[in-house]
């Protein structure tokens, strides 16, 4: 089945190839998460169906149960394919321009209805605000219109370069969330003054540990418009801290 081609918005500076336009249309559909009637009767691909053993002395009232072996969950309820997930896995081969495709998606599906990031507590200024930074008390965020990109350290600059190259001047604000600039970016993000934040898996892991102890990480204190996990196979072992940190991120849309 041939997918329809979708043109990116005028803010996108590059010319997409036909297959990239098809990918953009597919990704937009995945983010809208409109289930078909067939999806509601299909078993979710991450779940497996099993039958209870038939014995005379055991009657549980149902004939089947469902297992998700990836997260270890059991359920007696049918798990349909359409469970409101927005996003997916962009599994094209290397060299086909996956970063450019995702850049076109960021431009096409911007968050228009969500409010800008708002601190949960009252704004502070002056010396008191600076003291809160030194003691690690970042603004606690409810919801953001920004996209969070998590990538290996070696790819952070490449992501920023590609996003800026794909955007007309002044149409997309891109920042690296790493090292000493994290405190300044936390407050820029809290005022809705950035569209894309790029960080590393190492920073994500460190902030996750900090958040578990003190609850003071911007990355985990609110809901992102979109989270993109680049090179997601690096966290395929779900028992690692990096994998747990990635799962802990709250987002309306997720891509890997």
Segments (PLM) and residue ranges:
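Conserved ASCE P-loop NTPase core motifs with emphasis on AAA+ ATPases
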Residues: 1-3
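ASCE P-loop NTPase motor core, strongest for the SF2 helicase catalytic module
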Residues: 5-256
């Amino acid at each position: 089945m041939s997918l329809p081609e979708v043109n990116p918005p005028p803010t996108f500076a590059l010319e997409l190839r036909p297959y990239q336009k098809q990918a953009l249309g597919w990704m937009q559909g995945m983010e809208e998460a409109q289930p078909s009637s067939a999806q509601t009767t299909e078993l979710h691909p991450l779940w497996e169906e099993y039958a209870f053993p038939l014995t005379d002395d055991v009657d549980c009232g149902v004939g089947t149960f469902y297992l998700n072996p990836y997260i270890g969950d059991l359920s007696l309820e049918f798990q349909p394919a359409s469970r409101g997930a927005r996003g997916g896995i962009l599994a094209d081969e290397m060299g086909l321009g996956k970063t450019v495709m995702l850049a076109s998606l960021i431009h096409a599906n911007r968050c228009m209805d969500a409010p800008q990031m708002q601190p949960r507590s009252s704004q502070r200024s002056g010396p008191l605000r600076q003291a809160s930074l030194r003691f690690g008390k970042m603004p606690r965020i409810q919801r953001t219109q920004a996209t969070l990109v998590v990538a290996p350290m070696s790819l952070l600059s490449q992501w920023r370069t590609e996003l800026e190259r794909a955007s007309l001047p002044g149409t997309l604000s891109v920042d690296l969330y790493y090292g000493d600039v994290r405190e300044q970016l936390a407050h820029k993000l809290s005022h809705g003054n950035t569209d894309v934040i790029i960080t590393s898996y190492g920073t994500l892991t460190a902030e996750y540990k900090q958040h578990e102890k003190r609850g003071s990480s911007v990355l985990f204190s609110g809901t992102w418009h979109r989270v993109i996990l680049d090179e997601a196979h690096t966290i395929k072992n779900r028992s690692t801290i990096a994998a747990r940190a990635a799962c802990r991120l709250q987002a309306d849309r997720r891509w890997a």
